[in-house]
């Protein structure tokens, strides 16, 4: 594997173990060129998925982008990073097992919304503000009010 520091082509695996959720293998590597250490993750990919954007563009599904979006919504919230990882894994598996090779971005966003709703209400509202394209403070108020009402009812 190419070193991210010096671009040397060879590295040696020093340690290998499964992640906490068992969905990936974490490998500690050491570059044979510069001696730097870095970590890689190996994940199972059932098949290549394409996300269809609202404007019709197509992008290859990128798990890191999904995980980053969830992490941004959860920033400065008491959410364990392992739970973010598990949510991303669950969404990825749901997408991969859907039977379709293409999935609308809106469907992915809906899955994230569902997952965040169960994870953290503030993260849920943060994500919704982008996903639902809130334009004014009133949009936040209305949505947060609905979330608050649902929390009291359920």
Curated annotation (Swiss-Prot):
Coiled coil: none annotated. Keywords: ATP-binding, DNA-binding, Metal-binding, Nucleotide-binding, Repressor, Transcription, Transcription regulation, Zinc, Zinc-finger. Binds 1 zinc ion. InterPro entries: ATP-cone_dom, NrdR-like_N, RNR_NrdR-like. GO terms for molecular function: ATP binding; DNA binding; zinc ion binding. Residues 49-139 form the ATP-cone domain. It holds the Pfam family Zn_ribbon_NrdR. Residues 1-22 are annotated as: Disordered. Belongs to the NrdR family. This is Transcriptional repressor NrdR. The gene is nrdR.
